[in-house]
């Protein structure tokens, strides 16, 4: 088995989804490689164009459903953070994508395998190839798997922001800051759970649980914010 065939098999295993060999090979083919060949070779720019659109739709839909309380402007910011070049490069590095690229000699000799723009474009081309081979739902699932760490990071950021967000909301409406209280503590010392309540003018507006007091308060703030911003 030649190197290209081995590379394609490896990449398929990493993606965990069937893609036609020819289509997958096209997805990792840079324009510089195609231009150096005597025979006509398809490069990945059209697949990148398609993958970019599918990626944006999948992330937009995910954020829309995940954060029903956020306005359009905030959703746009989160999407931009997720589909930026840095985010795509992290995914490329996780797949060791540079190893599989088909590059022209000049591009290869000048560091093309590590070039951020090339890696990011190739991730989008792979998404385009998967979409053509399968369907939107399967491609979306692959995207969610690939972006799992980035989505989790945003989740953690959002939870951390809710205490600040509800503080601003409550002080603007009521003048006084919200108050937090731990109302339940259970479990052994090495595995405790906590329940917190957030109160506004002595009225409980949110309750949340967590493995630490801070997490419980953050989750209570999240619940309260969703309730008050309806």
Swiss-Prot record:
Pfam families: dsrm (PF00035), Ribonucleas_3_3 (PF14622). Residues 161-230 form the DRBM domain. GO terms for cellular component: cytoplasm. Keywords: Cytoplasm, Endonuclease, Hydrolase, Magnesium, Metal-binding, mRNA processing, Nuclease, RNA-binding, rRNA processing, rRNA-binding, tRNA processing. Gene3D superfamilies: 3.30.160.20, Ribonuclease III domain (1.10.1520.10). It is found in: Cytoplasm. Its cofactor is Mg(2+). Residues 8-135 form the RNase III domain. Its EC number is 3.1.26.3. GO terms for biological process: mRNA processing; regulation of gene expression; rRNA processing; tRNA processing. Mg(2+) binds at residues 48, 121, 124. It catalyses: Endonucleolytic cleavage to 5'-phosphomonoester. SUPFAM superfamilies: dsRNA-binding domain-like (SSF54768), RNase III domain-like (SSF69065). The active site is at residues 52, 124. One of its GO terms (molecular function) is metal ion binding. It comes from the Bacteria. CDD domains: DSRM_RNAse_III_family, RIBOc. Digests double-stranded RNA. Involved in the processing of primary rRNA transcript to yield the immediate precursors to the large and small rRNAs (23S and 16S). Processes some mRNAs, and tRNAs when they are encoded in the rRNA operon. Processes pre-crRNA and tracrRNA of type II CRISPR loci if present in the organism. Belongs to the ribonuclease III family. Homodimer. This is Ribonuclease 3. It comes from Natranaerobius thermophilus (strain ATCC BAA-1301 / DSM 18059 / JW/NM-WN-LF).
């Amino acid at each position: 088995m030649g190197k290209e065939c081995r590379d394609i098999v490896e990449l398929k295993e990493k993606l965990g989804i069937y893609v036609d060999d020819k289509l997958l090979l096209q997805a990792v083919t840079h324009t510089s490689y195609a231009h150096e060949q005597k025979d006509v070779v398809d490069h990945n720019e059209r697949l990148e164009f398609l993958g970019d659109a599918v990626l944006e739709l999948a992330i937009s839909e995910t954020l829309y459903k995940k954060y029903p309380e956020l306005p359009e402007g905030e959703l746009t910011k989160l999407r931009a953070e997720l589909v930026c070049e840095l985010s795509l490069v992290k995914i490329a590095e996780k797949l060791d994508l540079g190893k599989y690229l088909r590059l022209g000699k000049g591009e290869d000799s000048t560091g093309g395998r590590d070039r951020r723009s090339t890696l990011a474009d190739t991730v989008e081309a792979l998404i385009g190839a998967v979409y053509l081979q399968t369907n939107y739902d399967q491609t979306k699932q692959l995207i969610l798997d690939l972006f799992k760490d980035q989505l989790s990071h945003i989740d953690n950021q959002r939870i951390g922001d809710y205490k600040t967000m509800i503080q601003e909301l409550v002080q603007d409406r009521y003048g006084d800051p919200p108050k937090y209280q731990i109302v339940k503590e259970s479990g052994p010392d090495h595995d405790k759970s906590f329940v917190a309540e957030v109160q506004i003018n002595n009225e409980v507006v949110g309750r949340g649980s967590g493995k630490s007091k801070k997490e419980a308060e953050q989750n209570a703030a999240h619940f309260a914010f969703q309730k008050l911003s309806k």
